[in-house]
Design a protein with these regions (language model features):
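N-terminal beta1-alpha1-beta2 module of alpha/beta enzyme domains
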Residues: 1-71
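Flexible, glycine-rich active-site loops centered on histidine and acidic residues
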Residues: 4-23, 85-148, 187
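Hydrophobic faces of well-ordered beta-strands that scaffold small-molecule active sites
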Residues: 9-13, 45-47, 77-79, 107-111, ...
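Active-site mouth loops of central-metabolism enzymes
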Residues: 13-28, 82-90, 161-171, 279-288
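An alpha-helical appendage that flanks or caps ligand/catalytic pockets
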Residues: 129-156, 197-304
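A conserved active-site cap/scaffold subdomain adjacent to cofactor or substrate pockets
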Residues: 177-196, 202
Protein backbone atom coordinates (compact mmCIF):
# COMPACT_ATOMS: atom_id res chain seq x y z
CA UNK A 1 0.00 0.00 0.00
CA UNK A 2 1.07 3.58 -0.63
CA UNK A 3 2.03 5.92 2.18
CA UNK A 4 -0.48 8.77 2.59
CA UNK A 5 1.63 10.98 4.86
CA UNK A 6 2.82 13.14 1.95
CA UNK A 7 -0.47 13.15 0.06
CA UNK A 8 -2.41 16.43 0.37
CA UNK A 9 -6.11 16.17 1.21
CA UNK A 10 -8.50 18.80 -0.13
CA UNK A 11 -12.26 19.41 -0.20
CA UNK A 12 -14.84 20.15 -2.87
CA UNK A 13 -17.90 21.95 -1.50
CA UNK A 14 -21.31 22.22 -3.16
CA UNK A 15 -22.96 23.91 -0.15
CA UNK A 16 -25.53 21.13 0.30
CA UNK A 17 -28.86 22.24 1.72
CA UNK A 18 -31.54 20.67 3.88
CA UNK A 19 -35.11 21.15 2.67
CA UNK A 20 -36.24 23.54 5.42
CA UNK A 21 -32.93 25.33 5.83
CA UNK A 22 -32.35 28.89 4.62
CA UNK A 23 -29.64 29.75 2.13
CA UNK A 24 -28.00 31.86 4.83
CA UNK A 25 -27.83 28.87 7.17
CA UNK A 26 -26.42 26.63 4.45
CA UNK A 27 -23.71 29.11 3.53
CA UNK A 28 -22.85 29.68 7.19
CA UNK A 29 -22.40 25.91 7.51
CA UNK A 30 -20.05 25.93 4.50
CA UNK A 31 -17.97 28.63 6.19
CA UNK A 32 -17.79 26.64 9.44
CA UNK A 33 -16.86 23.53 7.46
CA UNK A 34 -14.09 25.45 5.65
CA UNK A 35 -12.78 26.83 8.93
CA UNK A 36 -12.60 23.30 10.34
CA UNK A 37 -10.65 22.16 7.28
CA UNK A 38 -8.33 25.15 7.62
CA UNK A 39 -7.54 24.37 11.27
CA UNK A 40 -6.95 20.69 10.50
CA UNK A 41 -4.41 21.38 7.76
CA UNK A 42 -6.31 20.53 4.58
CA UNK A 43 -4.68 21.84 1.41
CA UNK A 44 -7.53 23.32 -0.64
CA UNK A 45 -11.20 24.20 -0.32
CA UNK A 46 -12.85 24.45 -3.72
CA UNK A 47 -16.36 25.62 -4.55
CA UNK A 48 -18.30 24.09 -7.42
CA UNK A 49 -20.53 25.88 -9.95
CA UNK A 50 -24.11 24.65 -10.30
CA UNK A 51 -27.17 26.59 -11.41
CA UNK A 52 -30.90 26.14 -10.80
CA UNK A 53 -30.44 23.08 -8.60
CA UNK A 54 -32.58 23.04 -5.47
CA UNK A 55 -30.48 21.63 -2.67
CA UNK A 56 -27.20 23.09 -3.93
CA UNK A 57 -26.39 26.79 -3.39
CA UNK A 58 -23.00 27.25 -5.03
CA UNK A 59 -24.11 29.21 -8.11
CA UNK A 60 -22.06 32.37 -7.45
CA UNK A 61 -18.73 30.57 -7.21
CA UNK A 62 -16.35 33.54 -7.17
CA UNK A 63 -18.45 35.35 -4.53
CA UNK A 64 -18.32 32.32 -2.23
CA UNK A 65 -14.58 31.92 -2.78
CA UNK A 66 -13.98 35.49 -1.64
CA UNK A 67 -16.22 35.06 1.39
CA UNK A 68 -14.60 31.81 2.51
CA UNK A 69 -11.06 33.05 1.86
CA UNK A 70 -11.85 36.00 4.12
CA UNK A 71 -13.06 33.68 6.90
CA UNK A 72 -10.04 31.34 6.79
CA UNK A 73 -6.31 31.80 7.29
CA UNK A 74 -4.11 29.33 5.43
CA UNK A 75 -6.10 26.95 3.25
CA UNK A 76 -6.08 27.57 -0.50
CA UNK A 77 -9.55 28.49 -1.79
CA UNK A 78 -10.66 28.09 -5.36
CA UNK A 79 -13.11 27.04 -8.03
CA UNK A 80 -13.80 23.41 -8.68
CA UNK A 81 -14.64 24.72 -11.07
CA UNK A 82 -15.68 27.63 -13.19
CA UNK A 83 -17.56 26.31 -16.22
CA UNK A 84 -15.74 28.48 -18.72
CA UNK A 85 -18.29 28.38 -21.58
CA UNK A 86 -20.73 30.09 -19.17
CA UNK A 87 -18.44 33.10 -18.70
CA UNK A 88 -16.31 35.46 -20.81
CA UNK A 89 -12.61 34.73 -20.12
CA UNK A 90 -12.00 38.43 -19.43
CA UNK A 91 -14.60 38.46 -16.65
CA UNK A 92 -13.12 35.31 -15.11
CA UNK A 93 -9.63 36.84 -15.26
CA UNK A 94 -10.84 40.03 -13.58
CA UNK A 95 -12.70 38.13 -10.86
CA UNK A 96 -9.86 35.78 -10.02
CA UNK A 97 -7.24 38.48 -10.41
CA UNK A 98 -9.18 40.45 -7.81
CA UNK A 99 -9.38 37.42 -5.52
CA UNK A 100 -5.64 36.78 -5.87
CA UNK A 101 -4.92 40.43 -5.08
CA UNK A 102 -7.06 40.20 -1.94
CA UNK A 103 -5.72 36.81 -0.81
CA UNK A 104 -2.23 36.46 -2.35
CA UNK A 105 -0.99 32.93 -2.89
CA UNK A 106 -4.24 31.30 -1.78
CA UNK A 107 -6.45 31.25 -4.89
CA UNK A 108 -6.90 28.39 -7.40
CA UNK A 109 -8.86 28.44 -10.65
CA UNK A 110 -10.22 25.09 -11.81
CA UNK A 111 -11.85 25.14 -15.23
CA UNK A 112 -14.47 22.86 -16.76
CA UNK A 113 -16.54 22.94 -19.92
CA UNK A 114 -19.81 21.37 -18.76
CA UNK A 115 -22.93 23.55 -18.33
CA UNK A 116 -23.29 22.96 -14.60
CA UNK A 117 -27.03 22.68 -15.17
CA UNK A 118 -29.77 21.60 -17.58
CA UNK A 119 -30.24 22.87 -21.18
CA UNK A 120 -33.00 25.35 -20.28
CA UNK A 121 -30.87 26.91 -17.54
CA UNK A 122 -27.91 26.98 -19.92
CA UNK A 123 -29.92 29.14 -22.28
CA UNK A 124 -30.86 31.41 -19.38
CA UNK A 125 -27.12 31.81 -18.73
CA UNK A 126 -26.74 32.88 -22.39
CA UNK A 127 -24.42 29.93 -22.80
CA UNK A 128 -23.37 29.28 -26.41
CA UNK A 129 -22.80 25.55 -26.81
CA UNK A 130 -20.42 26.24 -29.69
CA UNK A 131 -18.11 27.91 -27.16
CA UNK A 132 -17.58 24.55 -25.49
CA UNK A 133 -16.01 23.41 -28.76
CA UNK A 134 -13.47 26.22 -28.40
CA UNK A 135 -12.62 25.43 -24.78
CA UNK A 136 -8.93 25.00 -25.60
CA UNK A 137 -8.76 28.48 -27.16
CA UNK A 138 -10.59 30.07 -24.23
CA UNK A 139 -8.24 28.46 -21.72
CA UNK A 140 -5.31 29.86 -23.72
CA UNK A 141 -6.96 33.29 -23.72
CA UNK A 142 -7.49 33.13 -19.97
CA UNK A 143 -3.88 32.09 -19.38
CA UNK A 144 -2.72 35.10 -21.39
CA UNK A 145 -5.00 37.47 -19.46
CA UNK A 146 -3.67 36.23 -16.11
CA UNK A 147 -0.05 36.22 -17.27
CA UNK A 148 2.40 39.09 -17.85
CA UNK A 149 1.37 41.66 -20.45
CA UNK A 150 3.22 41.10 -23.71
CA UNK A 151 2.20 44.30 -25.46
CA UNK A 152 0.28 42.61 -28.27
CA UNK A 153 -3.33 42.93 -27.09
CA UNK A 154 -5.57 45.97 -26.63
CA UNK A 155 -7.55 44.10 -23.95
CA UNK A 156 -5.99 43.61 -20.53
CA UNK A 157 -7.39 42.14 -17.31
CA UNK A 158 -6.98 44.80 -14.66
CA UNK A 159 -6.89 43.38 -12.05
CA UNK A 160 -5.77 39.96 -13.21
CA UNK A 161 -2.77 40.70 -15.35
CA UNK A 162 0.43 39.08 -14.08
CA UNK A 163 -1.30 37.50 -11.08
CA UNK A 164 -0.62 34.06 -12.61
CA UNK A 165 -3.47 32.45 -10.71
CA UNK A 166 -2.86 28.66 -10.88
CA UNK A 167 -5.14 27.11 -13.50
CA UNK A 168 -6.32 23.51 -13.28
CA UNK A 169 -8.28 21.56 -15.86
CA UNK A 170 -11.18 19.52 -14.50
CA UNK A 171 -12.99 16.71 -16.21
CA UNK A 172 -14.28 13.18 -16.35
CA UNK A 173 -13.28 12.24 -19.89
CA UNK A 174 -10.30 11.45 -22.07
CA UNK A 175 -10.71 14.85 -23.76
CA UNK A 176 -10.06 16.79 -20.58
CA UNK A 177 -7.14 14.52 -19.67
CA UNK A 178 -5.56 14.97 -23.09
CA UNK A 179 -5.99 18.73 -23.05
CA UNK A 180 -4.48 19.06 -19.57
CA UNK A 181 -1.53 16.96 -20.73
CA UNK A 182 -1.05 19.01 -23.90
CA UNK A 183 -1.13 22.29 -21.98
CA UNK A 184 1.08 21.06 -19.15
CA UNK A 185 -1.53 21.87 -16.51
CA UNK A 186 -2.50 20.02 -13.33
CA UNK A 187 -5.49 17.74 -13.82
CA UNK A 188 -8.41 17.05 -11.48
CA UNK A 189 -10.55 14.03 -12.36
CA UNK A 190 -14.18 14.08 -11.23
CA UNK A 191 -14.29 10.63 -9.70
CA UNK A 192 -16.87 11.82 -7.19
CA UNK A 193 -19.59 11.55 -9.84
CA UNK A 194 -18.13 10.01 -13.00
CA UNK A 195 -15.72 7.18 -12.16
CA UNK A 196 -16.11 5.28 -15.43
CA UNK A 197 -13.02 6.56 -17.25
CA UNK A 198 -10.79 7.25 -14.26
CA UNK A 199 -8.05 4.74 -15.07
CA UNK A 200 -7.88 5.55 -18.78
CA UNK A 201 -8.01 9.32 -18.23
CA UNK A 202 -5.23 9.42 -15.64
CA UNK A 203 -3.06 7.05 -17.69
CA UNK A 204 -3.57 9.20 -20.81
CA UNK A 205 -2.74 12.38 -18.91
CA UNK A 206 0.49 10.95 -17.51
CA UNK A 207 1.52 9.38 -20.81
CA UNK A 208 0.97 12.48 -22.95
CA UNK A 209 1.98 15.18 -20.45
CA UNK A 210 4.14 17.97 -21.89
CA UNK A 211 6.12 20.06 -19.38
CA UNK A 212 5.18 23.75 -19.31
CA UNK A 213 6.16 26.98 -17.61
CA UNK A 214 3.81 26.16 -14.73
CA UNK A 215 4.41 22.42 -14.29
CA UNK A 216 7.41 20.24 -15.07
CA UNK A 217 5.75 16.88 -14.39
CA UNK A 218 2.16 15.61 -14.30
CA UNK A 219 0.05 16.26 -11.23
CA UNK A 220 -3.22 14.41 -10.64
CA UNK A 221 -5.89 15.27 -8.10
CA UNK A 222 -8.73 12.77 -7.80
CA UNK A 223 -12.22 13.66 -6.60
CA UNK A 224 -13.81 11.06 -4.34
CA UNK A 225 -16.99 10.84 -2.26
CA UNK A 226 -15.96 10.27 1.36
CA UNK A 227 -17.93 9.06 4.36
CA UNK A 228 -15.67 8.66 7.38
CA UNK A 229 -17.06 7.81 10.81
CA UNK A 230 -16.04 6.05 14.03
CA UNK A 231 -16.98 2.61 12.71
CA UNK A 232 -17.60 0.99 9.34
CA UNK A 233 -21.22 0.40 10.34
CA UNK A 234 -21.81 4.05 11.27
CA UNK A 235 -20.23 5.17 8.01
CA UNK A 236 -22.49 2.87 5.98
CA UNK A 237 -25.50 4.34 7.79
CA UNK A 238 -24.40 7.95 7.16
CA UNK A 239 -23.68 7.13 3.50
CA UNK A 240 -27.39 6.67 2.82
CA UNK A 241 -27.72 10.47 2.72
CA UNK A 242 -25.55 10.64 -0.40
CA UNK A 243 -27.34 7.65 -1.92
CA UNK A 244 -30.73 9.33 -1.45
CA UNK A 245 -29.34 12.50 -3.00
CA UNK A 246 -28.08 10.78 -6.14
CA UNK A 247 -31.36 8.88 -6.38
CA UNK A 248 -33.18 12.23 -6.32
CA UNK A 249 -30.85 13.53 -9.05
CA UNK A 250 -31.66 10.58 -11.28
CA UNK A 251 -35.37 11.08 -10.71
CA UNK A 252 -35.17 14.80 -11.48
CA UNK A 253 -36.10 15.75 -7.91
CA UNK A 254 -34.61 18.46 -5.64
CA UNK A 255 -31.25 17.51 -4.16
CA UNK A 256 -32.05 18.23 -0.51
CA UNK A 257 -29.88 16.54 2.08
CA UNK A 258 -31.98 13.79 3.64
CA UNK A 259 -31.55 12.14 7.02
CA UNK A 260 -29.72 8.80 6.88
CA UNK A 261 -31.85 5.66 6.95
CA UNK A 262 -31.27 2.15 8.27
CA UNK A 263 -31.82 0.64 4.84
CA UNK A 264 -32.32 1.83 1.27
CA UNK A 265 -34.55 -1.14 0.51
CA UNK A 266 -37.95 0.07 -0.58
CA UNK A 267 -36.59 3.49 -1.54
CA UNK A 268 -35.16 2.45 -4.90
CA UNK A 269 -35.68 -0.13 -7.61
CA UNK A 270 -33.02 -2.68 -8.53
CA UNK A 271 -32.10 -0.66 -11.60
CA UNK A 272 -31.89 2.58 -9.61
CA UNK A 273 -29.69 0.87 -7.03
CA UNK A 274 -27.29 -0.17 -9.77
CA UNK A 275 -27.24 3.36 -11.24
CA UNK A 276 -26.61 5.02 -7.89
CA UNK A 277 -23.86 2.56 -7.01
CA UNK A 278 -22.20 3.13 -10.38
CA UNK A 279 -22.39 6.91 -9.83
CA UNK A 280 -20.77 6.50 -6.41
CA UNK A 281 -18.43 3.76 -7.58
CA UNK A 282 -15.31 5.37 -6.12
CA UNK A 283 -16.89 6.15 -2.74
CA UNK A 284 -14.64 5.63 0.26
CA UNK A 285 -16.86 4.67 3.20
CA UNK A 286 -15.75 3.42 6.59
CA UNK A 287 -14.00 3.94 9.88
CA UNK A 288 -10.47 5.30 10.05
CA UNK A 289 -8.68 2.03 9.30
CA UNK A 290 -10.93 1.18 6.36
CA UNK A 291 -10.69 4.66 4.88
CA UNK A 292 -6.91 4.68 5.19
CA UNK A 293 -6.63 1.28 3.52
CA UNK A 294 -8.94 2.22 0.64
CA UNK A 295 -7.21 5.54 -0.02
CA UNK A 296 -3.80 3.87 0.03
CA UNK A 297 -4.95 1.31 -2.53
CA UNK A 298 -6.48 3.97 -4.78
CA UNK A 299 -3.35 6.09 -4.61
CA UNK A 300 -1.16 3.15 -5.53
CA UNK A 301 -3.41 1.85 -8.30
CA UNK A 302 -4.20 5.16 -9.99
CA UNK A 303 -1.00 7.11 -9.22
CA UNK A 304 -2.80 9.96 -7.47
CA UNK A 305 -0.86 12.97 -6.16
CA UNK A 306 -3.70 14.58 -4.18
CA UNK A 307 -7.24 13.72 -3.12
CA UNK A 308 -10.19 16.13 -3.11
CA UNK A 309 -13.27 14.90 -1.27
CA UNK A 310 -16.98 15.55 -1.40
CA UNK A 311 -18.55 14.91 2.00
CA UNK A 312 -22.34 14.81 1.74
CA UNK A 313 -23.49 14.07 5.27
CA UNK A 314 -26.73 15.28 6.82
CA UNK A 315 -25.34 16.90 9.96
CA UNK A 316 -22.58 19.50 9.93
CA UNK A 317 -21.10 17.86 13.04
CA UNK A 318 -20.73 14.57 11.15
CA UNK A 319 -19.04 16.38 8.26
CA UNK A 320 -16.61 17.99 10.69
CA UNK A 321 -15.91 14.69 12.43
CA UNK A 322 -15.16 13.11 9.05
CA UNK A 323 -12.54 15.82 8.54
CA UNK A 324 -10.99 15.00 11.91
CA UNK A 325 -10.69 11.36 10.87
CA UNK A 326 -9.15 12.32 7.53
CA UNK A 327 -6.73 14.67 9.27
CA UNK A 328 -5.56 11.86 11.54
CA UNK A 329 -4.84 9.78 8.43
CA UNK A 330 -3.15 12.69 6.67
CA UNK A 331 -0.90 13.44 9.64
Amino acid sequence: MSDLSNTPFSLLELSPMKEHETVSQTLANSVTYAQTADKLGFNRFWMAEHHNMRGIVCAATSVLIGHIAGKTQNIRVGAGGVMLPNHPPLVVAEQFGTLESLYPGRIDLGLGRAPGSDPITSRALRRDEQRAEHFNDEVTELQALLGPYKGDSPVRAIPGEDTNVPIWLLGSSLYSAGLAAKKGLPYAFAGHFAPRFVEDAIALYRREFQPSEVLDKPYVMLGLPIVAADTDEQAQFLATTAKQRILALMRGKPLWLKEPVATMEGLWTAQEKMQVENFLGLSVVGGQASVKHKLSMIKQTLQVDEFIFTNDLYELSDRQHALEILASIMN
